[in-house]
Amino acid sequence: MRVGIKVLGCPKNEADCEILAGVLRERGHEIVFDVKDADVVVLDTCAFIEDAKRESIDEIFSFIDAKDQYSYKLVVKGCLVQRYYEELKKEIPEVDQWIGVVDPEEIANALEKGTDLVPNRPETVYRYRKRIDLEERPYAYVKISDGCDRGCTFCSIPSFKGSLRSRSIEDITHEVEDLLKEGKKEIILVAQDTTSYGIDLYRKQALPDLLRRLNSLNGEFWIRVMYLHPDHLTEEIISAMLELDKVVKYFDVPVQHGSDKILKLMGRTKSSEELKKMLSSIRERFPDAVLRTSIIVGFPGETEEDFEELKRFVEEIQFDKLGAFVYSDEEGTVAFNLKEKVDPEVAKRRQEELLLLQAEISNSRLDRFIGRKLKFLVEGKEGKFLVGRTWTEAPEVDGVVFVRGKGKIGDFLEVVIKEHDEYDMWGSVT
């Protein structure tokens, strides 16, 4: 069976699909990278917010339109299916097979049988198997846990991802060791909430233990941690990230808002002052630390006063990177039933206003790197420039660095930063 895999959604889906590709190859199937060569196309979907659902539906119909030309079987899997299986099966009969949130071995079994598989409870924590790169790049996402027990009122993820389920430190270490042998230079740890890693297995927050284990591995590489829930970002986790030399000093902390009223409605436990104190303490200990966050505007009940409070919060913290998203009303969440919905046009205006403010802040924050030497990871080439990132940027969500000089994908180079705009930097090899 020749299988093509198309991934939508978050980096956790990318990690899952690379494991699935490895399982299928182990079973004798061929992984192809062009749908015209495939007997089966597997489309992995996202169902987090309305935009993600719309993108998934659009992609399903794009692949349906191409079926007659290329004669492949279309299999749709993942979060959208886990959440809306009955409706999808009824409304889109052109799809040949539906698979929910399932362990890669079980997905492979279902593909071989040709039967639908949507469990009542998600099953996505797997033991490590050899991965196959679906894209050529010098970094890899490693999923350390799945599911979430936090109960944020706006979030639908627990309804289709289930409760927290962590992989063992030994299993994750095995995966990372293999990735390093294959030449990966950056290991990016992902989960719905990385701060909760290990609570179910070890009865404690085990992220510091995992980081220490990975930091002890041989080789020159970066370790990056994403999705640090602010309510449970402890002093021990912060200290481990600041003290371990291979862990980049990059803190992805999705605070979601800066108004105490809205934070409480969101089900968050830390106040804006507590958030400020925590984030400021990171900068006090490591002034160059990069702080990234995510913000939701237009949450039910958000007034102009709340929004102004949010802007003051953002100005005070001076985040290096910030993603701003309009609230998505998701059925099955607590927030779905809240009154005082914000007009979509008002929410969109607030998003644009916040992003303009952040562009000024980001531009100012990058000034500190002008004239300095930074370690640079080559990811490709664009015209006369090498393109890649320093430790200050995460892939896909942040800017990039354009560098004059020679190098190949996966090289670490020392570069001098010469200029920047709000998001990207330019420099040259020293």
From Swiss-Prot:
GO MF terms held by the record: 4 iron, 4 sulfur cluster binding; aspartic acid methylthiotransferase activity; metal ion binding; protein methylthiotransferase activity
Substrates-to-products reaction catalysed: L-aspartate(89)-[ribosomal protein uS12]-hydrogen + (sulfur carrier)-SH + AH2 + 2 S-adenosyl-L-methionine = 3-methylsulfanyl-L-aspartate(89)-[ribosomal protein uS12]-hydrogen + (sulfur carrier)-H + 5'-deoxyadenosine + L-methionine + A + S-adenosyl-L-homocysteine + 2 H(+)
Enzyme class: transferase
EC number: 2.8.4.4
CDD domains (UniProt xref): Radical_SAM (cd01335)
Domain TRAM: from-to ranges: 367-430
Keyword Metal-binding attached: yes
Cellular component, GO, one term: cytosol
The Radical SAM core domain, residue ranges: 134-365
Compartmental location: Cytoplasm
Residues forming coiled coils: none
Note describing how the cofactor binds: Binds 2 [4Fe-4S] clusters. One cluster is coordinated with 3 cysteines and an exchangeable S-adenosyl-L-methionine.
Functional description taken from the UniProt entry: Catalyzes the methylthiolation of an aspartic acid residue of ribosomal protein uS12.
NCBIfam families linked: 30S ribosomal protein S12 methylthiotransferase RimO, MiaB/RimO family radical SAM methylthiotransferase
Protein name, UniProt field: Ribosomal protein uS12 methylthiotransferase RimO
Source organism of the structure: Thermotoga sp. (strain RQ2)
Gene that encodes the chain: rimO
